[in-house]
């Protein structure tokens, strides 16, 4: 059975994007690093900011691509190749429009669902056989509003809900790392 060796937090690089809904993946890995007293260092060769942590006695690389969302797969594939990490050993954390704020879901494989970061990762890895932790940000109501919505900051109430979802996901990280997926899915997917 595989174990997770890399956690990718999707988002866009730059202060103007740091607090936007599209960067909730980055928020997630930043919280893991903070909880483990680690900081990220820039790795231009691998097109990312990297931190290394130990989760339940497993060495895990935290990756924040510095390529912008639409080319996240470049960094993911470079890091995976450098550390010899298989797609099944990767957890990608990202924003999800089709899930309410405060909700979080775990998924293995599947399509990109219009998410450009996932599309890029699928293309660069040549597979969609990796785990995803989908953090709900809610939907603006009409597809014409999506681009502005994901690139804007959440309300204070929505930010609290998203932070709560992140904390909830981190509570299950040991089991996710060790591929104990069924109990995690059962708990996360039950209201």
Curated annotation (Swiss-Prot):
Catalytic activity: an N-acyl-L-alpha-aminoacyl-tRNA + H2O = an N-acyl-L-amino acid + a tRNA + H(+)
Keyword Transmembrane among UniProt keywords: no
GO biological process, alphabetically ordered: protein quality control for misfolded or incompletely synthesized proteins; rescue of stalled ribosome
One Gene Ontology term of the molecular function aspect: tRNA binding
Residues the record marks as site: Stabilizes the basic form of H active site to accept a proton: 95
Keywords: Cytoplasm, Hydrolase, RNA-binding, tRNA-binding
Stretches assigned to coiled coil: none
Binding site for tRNA: 17, 68, 70, 116
GO cellular component, as recorded: cytoplasm
Site (Discriminates between blocked and unblocked aminoacyl-tRNA) location in chain: 12
EC number: 3.1.1.29
Residues at the active site: 22
Subcellular location: Cytoplasm
Primary location recorded for the protein, binned into one broad class: cytoplasm
SUPFAM superfamilies associated with the record: Peptidyl-tRNA hydrolase-like (SSF53178)
InterPro entries associated with the record: Pept_tRNA_hydro, Pept_tRNA_hydro_CS, Pept_tRNA_hydro_sf
Entry keyword annotation includes RNA-binding: yes
Subunit structure and binding partners: Monomer.
NCBIfam families hit by this protein: pth (TIGR00447)
Its job: Hydrolyzes ribosome-free peptidyl-tRNAs (with 1 or more amino acids incorporated), which drop off the ribosome during protein synthesis, or as a result of ribosome stalling. Catalyzes the release of premature peptidyl moieties from peptidyl-tRNA molecules trapped in stalled 50S ribosomal subunits, and thus maintains levels of free tRNAs and 50S ribosomes.
Family of this protein: Belongs to the PTH family.
Database matches in HAMAP family: Pept_tRNA_hydro_bact
Protein name: Peptidyl-tRNA hydrolase
Organism in which the protein naturally occurs: Francisella tularensis subsp. novicida (strain U112)
UniProt gene name: pth
């Amino acid at each position: 059975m595989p174990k997770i060796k890399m956690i990718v937090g999707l988002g866009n690089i730059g202060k103007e994007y740091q607090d936007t809904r599209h960067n909730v993946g980055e928020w997630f890995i930043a919280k893991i690093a903070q909880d483990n007293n680690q900081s990220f260092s820039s790795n231009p060769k691998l097109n990312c900011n990297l931190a290394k942590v130990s989760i339940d006695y497993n060495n895990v690389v935290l990756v924040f691509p510095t390529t912008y969302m639409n080319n996240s797969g470049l960094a993911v594939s470079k890091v995976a190749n450098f550390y010899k990490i298989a797609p099944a050993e990767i957890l990608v954390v990202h924003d999800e429009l089709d899930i309410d704020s405060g909700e979080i879901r775990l998924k293995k494989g599947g399509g990109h669902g219009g998410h450009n970061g996932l599309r890029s990762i699928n293309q660069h890895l040549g597979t969609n056989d990796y785990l995803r932790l989908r953090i709900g940000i809610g939907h603006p109501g009409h597809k014409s509003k999506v681009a502005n919505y994901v690139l804007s900051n959440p309300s204070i109430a929505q930010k609290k809900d998203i932070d709560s979802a992140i904390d909830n996901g981190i509570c299950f990280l040991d089991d996710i790392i060790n591929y104990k997926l069924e109990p995690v899915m059962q708990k996360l997917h039950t209201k």
